[in-house]
């Protein structure tokens, strides 16, 4: 039978240190939805992105209100072509139900926008993403 048995250690000034509770160890290894998303997006990792999205996921275009399904967005996000550059990216709010972000985006075309993004979450996965954008001077 293998396994790790926690033991006590003597710390500074000879104090006995107890091992951290297992829950603390587990929590330290969990990443937020945003951290997982950023890692997968930067790597163009289709499987990791797909795992973060519900099968019913839709992206709503702010210009037209048109809904784009999961597979079409995955194809767009992992394509080998030029990508948008995200500047001053920040998470405004994140919990188990919603992620709200803001960023300035430089598009390959030279256009620039300030973008507010919202991702609705269901069971830890993105179910709907929508953005609102304001054109910025170049």
Task: Name the predicted role of every residue range.
Residues 30, 36-37, 50, 67, ...:
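Generic alpha-helical hydrophobic packing signal
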Residues 22-23, 42, 60-64, 71-138:
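A beta-strand edge to alpha-helix "cap/lid" segment located at domain peripheries
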Residues 8-51, 55, 138:
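Short, low-complexity N-terminal intrinsically disordered segments enriched in polar/charged residues
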């Amino acid at each position: 039978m293998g396994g790790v048995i926690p033991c006590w250690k003597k710390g500074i000034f000879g104090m006995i240190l107890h091992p951290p509770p297992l829950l603390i160890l587990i929590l330290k290894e969990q990443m937020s939805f945003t951290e997982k998303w950023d890692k997968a997006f930067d790597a163009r990792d289709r499987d990791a992105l797909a795992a973060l999205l519900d099968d019913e996921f839709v992206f709503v275009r702010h210009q037209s209100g048109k809904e784009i399904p999961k597979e079409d967005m995955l194809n767009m996000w992992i394509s080998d072509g030029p990508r948008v550059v995200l500047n001053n990216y920040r998470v405004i709010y994140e919990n188990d139900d919603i992620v709200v972000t803001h960023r300035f985006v430089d598009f390959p075309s030279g256009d620039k926008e300030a973008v507010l993004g919202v991702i609705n979450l269901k069971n830890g996965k993105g179910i709907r993403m929508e953005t609102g954008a304001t054109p910025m001077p170049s």
